[in-house]
Amino acid sequence: MTAITISDQEYRDFSRFLESQCGIVLGDSKQYLVRSRLSPLVAKFKLTSLSDLLRDVVTGRNRELRVAAVDAMTTNETLWFRDAYPFTVLAERLLPEVAANKRPIKIWSAASSSGQEPYSMAMTVLETQQRKPGMLPSVAITATDISASMLDMCKAGIYDNLALGRGLSPERRKIFFEDAGDGRMKIKDNVKRLVNFRPQNLMESYALLGKFDIIFCRNVLIYFSPDMKSKVLNQMASSLNPGGYLLLGASESLTGLTDKFEMVRCNPGIIYKLK
């Protein structure tokens, strides 16, 4: 029987490793999360215990295992049109405002997870184009994630009924999806064409991504240390075009982290504009 217990020292060593690799801070009491996320890898990599796995990850003995462990720890659940208001603001305020510049609109989904956020953006763009023909120039959405398995899922664009039921209306499901068999649905090509998926560690440089008019970095900063939050936010400020916008998660704030943005109150919600 595989041992799935870990010592306090093993947990601390792995926590330091994870923060150094991708900025995620586990804190003092997330042993249960490490066990639940990494235990399946013990059998997959033919190890005898979770302790052996953590040792090999921390020491770098097995690069493939390291990648798999980071992948497992950075995979998070998400929803279609999460919190609703960011997509309302995108449609009713941000897209029209940026469109007035008469140049292509560039949007970044900074932690795309399994694709619900960037595809929700793409659906919002298509709905706006239908509602206001000719208003929008071309729109390009870049969606990034650190997890290779999540990016593969994003690119496939195939979801089961459980995933589809989390925030997606029957109307949008009918318009933007097609049958993929086995009770699953696939994002239509006109939605997929708007989104380019690529790997990105938020601890590393964003320079190769280019500049954006709008950045969604929602429900990501909550996992980072204050120093890491500041680093990410200041890099994102440098990645925005003049007057660009940043949207955070409903429980996230810039207070004490950066002075490069001004808060803009919407109805509902709050967004941030580059100074």
Swiss-Prot record:
Molecular function GO labels: protein-glutamate O-methyltransferase activity
A Pfam match: CheR_N
EC number annotated for this UniProt entry: 2.1.1.80
Catalytic activity: L-glutamyl-[protein] + S-adenosyl-L-methionine = [protein]-L-glutamate 5-O-methyl ester + S-adenosyl-L-homocysteine
Domain CheR-type methyltransferase: 1-275
One of the GO BP terms on file: methylation
EC class name: transferase
Keywords: Methyltransferase, S-adenosyl-L-methionine, Transferase
Binding positions (S-adenosyl-L-methionine): N76, T78, R82, E117, D145, N201, L202, R218, N219
Protein role: Methylation of the membrane-bound methyl-accepting chemotaxis proteins (MCP) to form gamma-glutamyl methyl ester residues in MCP.
Name this polypeptide is given: Chemotaxis protein methyltransferase
Taxonomic source organism: Vibrio anguillarum (Listonella anguillarum)
